[in-house]
Amino acid sequence: MSHSKEIISYMNRLGSEAKDASSVLAQASIEQRNASLDFIAEAIELNRDKILSTNQKDLELAKQKSIGSALIDRLELNDNRIDSMISGLKIVSDLPDPVGEITDLDPTPSGIEVKKMRVPLGVVGIIYESRPNVTADAAALCLKSGNSCLLRGGSEAILSNKIIWNCLQKGLNKSGLPKECVQLVETTDREAVKTLLHLDEYLDVVIPRGGKGLVQLISDESRIPVIKHLDGICHVFIDKDADHQKAQDIAFNAKTYRYGICGAMETLLIHSEIANSLLPSLTKRFESEGVELRGCDKTLEISEMIAANEDDWSTEYLAPILSIKI
C-alpha cells in the first residue's frame, strides 16, 4: 500500500469512528457529558507533571528548528496554563445544557407553533496551530454540545497534544462515553490535513484556528462547510472621557499579557483631546516593558518613537510591537 493510501485509510477510519461515536454522544444525558468533562479535568491534574515534561520536549525541538518567539510562546505550557485548562473544563461543565434548548417560538395564524431546537451537528473537525491547550478547550466545547470531534493540531505540538488527548480518553472512559468521541490525528503528515478536508461523508463542519494562511488553505481545499475567523488585528480605543488610570491599565494588559495570541492588541487609538496628557506616561510604561512603539505623525509630536508606515495599521505583529494613532 502506498503512503498516500495509508493516510487516506487512516483518516477514513478516524472519521468513521467519530461518526459512530457521535450517535451515542448526541443521546447522552447532560449528567454524563458533564461527568466526562469533570473526569478529564481530574486526569489533566493527575498527569500535570507528565504534560509539562512532554511539552518541554516539544519546546526543545521547536527551538532547534529556530521557530519564532510568538509560536514558542503559544506552544509553551506551564502551571498557570494547565490551571487555565482545568478551570476552562469546569466552566464549560457548569454551563447550561445547549442540547434540546428551544428558541424563537413563533405562533402562526393557523395556530401551529414553529420553534427552533438546538441539536448537535454531528462531527466537528478542528485544525489548529501551536497551542496544545486547544486540544482540551475544543474537545470540551464539542462534548458539552453533544458533538464528536476530530482534532488535528500543529506538528510542533504533537507530543503535548498526544499526552493531553490521553487525558481526554481517560475521562471519556471513566464517564462511560466512547473514547472515539474525541479523535486525534496522530500523524504530522500534511497529507492528513488534505484528506481530513475531504471527509464530507463523516464530518459535518470544519473549524480552523490559526493564522491567515491556515484559514485560507482550509477555505480553498475543504469539501465540508467551514466556520472561520479573520485576521486578529485587535484595536483598543481610549475615548476623551475615559478614566486615565483605568485606560492605561487596560491598554497595557491588552498588549503585554501575551504577545503571541490573536487576541493581543496590535493598534492603540487615542482621542485627540486626551493624547497630550495620556501618551507620555503610557509610552514610558510600554517602553519599560520592551515594547517597540510605532506612531502616526500626531503621536510623534508628543512622544518619541518609530514612525509608523501604512502597513503597520494592517499588521498582526504577534510580538512586542504596537502601533499608536491619534
Give the predicted meaning of each segment.
Residues M1-V114:
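N-terminal Rossmann-like NAD(P)+-binding subdomain of aldehyde/semialdehyde dehydrogenases
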Residues I8, E17, S130-N133, D137-S145, ...:
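ALDH superfamily catalytic-core signature
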Residues S29, R33, G146, V206, ...:
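Residue-level signal for inorganic ion chemistry
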Residues S36, T188-E191, S277:
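Short, conserved clusters of charged catalytic residues that mark active-site
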Residues I40, E156, E266-I270:
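Conserved short loop/turn motifs at secondary-structure junctions
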Residues D94, T103-D241, Q245:
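Rossmann-like NAD(P) dinucleotide-binding subdomain of oxidoreductase/dehydrogenase enzymes
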